Amino acid sequence: MSERFPLYTTNYIGGVMSLRKPQIASLKILEEIVTSVNLRKGMNLRAALGSVHAMYPTCSDFEREFMSITFVLATGVGKTRLMGAFIAYLYTQHNIKNFFVVAPNTTIYNKLKRDLSDNNNPKYVFRGLGCFPVLPQIIADDDYRDKAISLYDSEIHIFIYNIDKFNKEGANMRKVNELLGDSFYQYLSNLPDLVLIMDESHHYRAEKGAQALNDLHPLLGLELTATPLVTAGTKQVPFKNVVYEYPLSKAIEDGYTRTPFAVTRSDIDFYNFGDEQLDKMMLLDGIACHERTKGELEVYATNHSTPEKPVRTVKPFMLVVCKDTDHAAWVENFIKSDEFRNGAYRNKTITVHSRQKGAETEANTRLLLDVENPSNPVEIVIHVNMLKEGWDVNNLYTIVPLRTAASKILREQMVGRGLRLPYGERTGDRDVDAVMLTAHDKFQDILAEAQKGDSIFKAGNVIKAEDLDEPEEITYTQL
């Protein structure tokens, strides 16, 4: 127990921060590991691994040149809040004051910076904690060039960097800085208590990124991801340093996300369907789901609003996932044609992919970032691959994967983009608490996975698309 912060046990931190069960479990595992291992710079990694492996056999290798452990948490459970809990615990109980948070892309970097630094932000992770008389000092971007870090008032320094910028700026970061009296890299690597926190850590397994992090010589690495897999050629290799796993199926079962539903048809045999014919049917069935959901969300908000406590109306959108840019162009042309709902979505559809340039990219990206806004006209987003990690949208209700949902992992990743709860918790209304995945051509695969018991659809339902035109006849069939 810390003499300075005796109150700050894992239970106390969990209560003040309103942590969920998997977050508290992760925090307690960190406590057990850190108190069991002689945590210090230059420690015997083999002995440390032996201790951790004895407690958590799934951890058989740190996989880095420093002690690093992975916590696998499903999308939407709250990885950023858990980071805040890790920082609060390590500071109050182990006097650790330097944290380096790594983001995989600009979107997540901006989100982390906002959630860790802006105490006016509703998602500020340290809200309620009284252990920081002066807010933790955030060092990001080019702060290392023009600020004297040692002069900051706060005891705690949180460095936040996008891995791409960190890799590209490597040469500059290794140059001597007059304010530091050393290079930024050397300054960091000389810190006796630097803890590395890696968000979406499956992105930092490539040789260049991994070595850049190894060169920081941190005391400890804490990895957070929902996808503990590394692609090696044609194979996906599981992480070897996992100490805790909370899968998507468990998050759904525990009510921390919306419930996925598979949409299919029982009145048509798809065996002789061509690709375009099947695409058109899935798009039309998808938009029927979208329109029905839009109506149900409006009804829910109206029925549950009072003058004292109005309930906002959630504006849903539909995501169409295409196999490549040519396919996306064909889909966009079809959706904007009179053949698709008489052209009703002509001005409510955007396409986002890497080949777009200039003004088109900026305009569509702006609309995508703002897709939760009720005044945003977009109701259909056409995307190659899928919405990237970091798009924390809570109004994606219908997902139409065209020629792309070939594997269980891909289906889970797609559905994962639409699991966040728009009201922060389940409402008890089946339609408000659902996300739809059209699965006409993969329904038998989904059914087989469900029967094995390891699918995100195992406790879910099937919606028969042929019933969508008659809402009162919609059947929710247990898988």
PLM regions: where:
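Conserved SF1/SF2 helicase motif Ia
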Residues: 70-77, 84-110
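Helicase-associated low-complexity regulatory tails and linkers flanking the ATPase motor
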Residues: 28, 93-96, 110, 120-137, ...
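Walker B catalytic acidic pair
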Residues: 199-200, 386
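ATP-binding Walker
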Residues: 77-78, 386, 405
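Conserved pre-motif I regulatory segment
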Residues: 2-72
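Conserved SAM-binding loop
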Residues: 19, 101, 320
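SF2 helicase motor core recognition
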Residues: 381-396, 416-418
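Pre-Walker A (Motif I) flank of P-loop NTPase domains
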Residues: 59-60, 64-70, 97, 315-318, ...
